[in-house]
UniProtKB/Swiss-Prot annotation:
CDD domains: HP_PGM_like (cd07067). HAMAP family: PGAM_GpmB. Its EC number is 5.4.2.-. The gene is gpmB. Keywords: Glycolysis, Isomerase. This is Probable phosphoglycerate mutase GpmB.
Amino acid sequence: MLQVYLVRHGETQWNAERRIQGQSDSPLTAHGERQAWQVGERARTLGITHIITSDLGRTRRTAEIIAEACGCSVIADARLRELDMGVLEKRHIDSLSDEEEGWRRQLVNGTPDGRIPQGESMQELSERMHAALASCLELPAGSRPLLVSHGIALGCLVSTILGLPAYAERRLRLRNCSISRVDYQQSPWLASGWVVETAGDVSHLDAPAMDELQR
């Protein structure tokens, strides 16, 4: 059985400022760097053999910190990028017009082929995330990879593994530097294919995540 760990990047400056990131980027805060070190301490005990990350800066930095703890190299895979939020990227969430908020809601509420202008649909996101995950099946026997990605992207992946629509990711709370795990199994009695073992574990973090403080 292949075990794959899924980690959301550490807190960023734009997370703190409530700006829409998408495939734009901002650096980790000092708290985000600390979160990544704490993931590294947990990952050191898990026997991680490969660290594969979105090629955006915030995930790369998170992956580099984890890799230092695990003694692994980092492999970049653009398929693990966040949802492309088009013309709304870099915008403060509270600055959106009614029309712009409508675009965002169409996307996250599951309107068929809903997308922000110049952005990506949830279906497109789901397809590339599943392709990236499937690549883990090609790793040598005994591998235990850890993927570093983004909140909406990972939520979409976990939701669709569970048989839910991609937009159900809004019902999952995957905080910064949370750890999830999915397993690939073949069984005559249980579900074959990908199954979700854990989602959104933050027991390794020693301080509340920002979205806990903003509730």
